[in-house]
Amino acid sequence: MIGRLSGKLIEKLPPQVVVDVNGVGYEVDVPMTTFYQLPALGQPCTLFTHLAVREDAHLLYGFASKEERQTFRQLIKVTGIGAKIALAILSGMTADELAIAVASEDIKRLSAVPGIGKKTAERLVLELRGKLATGGNLTVPGGLPFAATPDEKSDIVNALLALGYNEKEAAAATKSLPADVTVSEGVRLALKSLMKV
């Protein structure tokens, strides 16, 4: 089992990153909450990982903290929730927000995540109640300290596509974003507008 990777971040394309560890590049899928916390390309980074072994592939999922990884592991134990949907959930809300939504039985908030219908949201509440703790340290950073360039706007669109939205929805959600929006703030605002629909 690969539990942690420490190396140099050499690629970033939401939701996947590549971490070079002693000359070996590991492809790792990460939730957007982790993606925003990653350093610039070429900088050292550490990810807590979960290795999923399938018949046709070995897949690595990375997280900024052990707590976020544990939340992911709890999510994939829920009937009908696979790794892709678990990443979408952790991309749409922090582990703390998920714990609060489950504890308060906020079906509307949970079913706003792409791929989660009302029945699945109810199952999440039923199967996760009492199993998720809020740690207070799993929040999305306020944003990057620079304005969104066209590349950053495409990062916002890519993030929405990775969360299960189609290109039309992603384009509509990013069309009205302010020109000076940061990537993390842009995704947050886009998700907020998509969840109102």
UniProtKB/Swiss-Prot annotation:
InterPro entries according to UniProt: DNA_helicase_Holl-junc_RuvA_I, Hlx-hairpin-Hlx_DNA-bd_motif, NA-bd_OB-fold, RuvA, RuvA_2-like, RuvA_C, RuvA_C_sf
Function: The RuvA-RuvB-RuvC complex processes Holliday junction (HJ) DNA during genetic recombination and DNA repair, while the RuvA-RuvB complex plays an important role in the rescue of blocked DNA replication forks via replication fork reversal (RFR). RuvA specifically binds to HJ cruciform DNA, conferring on it an open structure. The RuvB hexamer acts as an ATP-dependent pump, pulling dsDNA into and through the RuvAB complex. HJ branch migration allows RuvC to scan DNA until it finds its consensus sequence, where it cleaves and resolves the cruciform DNA.
Entry text on domains: Has three domains with a flexible linker between the domains II and III and assumes an 'L' shape. Domain III is highly mobile and contacts RuvB.
Complex and partners: Homotetramer. Forms an RuvA(8)-RuvB(12)-Holliday junction (HJ) complex. HJ DNA is sandwiched between 2 RuvA tetramers; dsDNA enters through RuvA and exits via RuvB. An RuvB hexamer assembles on each DNA strand where it exits the tetramer. Each RuvB hexamer is contacted by two RuvA subunits (via domain III) on 2 adjacent RuvB subunits; this complex drives branch migration. In the full resolvosome a probable DNA-RuvA(4)-RuvB(12)-RuvC(2) complex forms which resolves the HJ.
Region (Domain III): 148-197
DNA repair is among the record's keywords: yes
Record-given protein name: Holliday junction branch migration complex subunit RuvA
GO molecular function: ATP binding; four-way junction DNA binding; four-way junction helicase activity
Region (Flexible linker): 143-147
Gene expressing this chain: ruvA
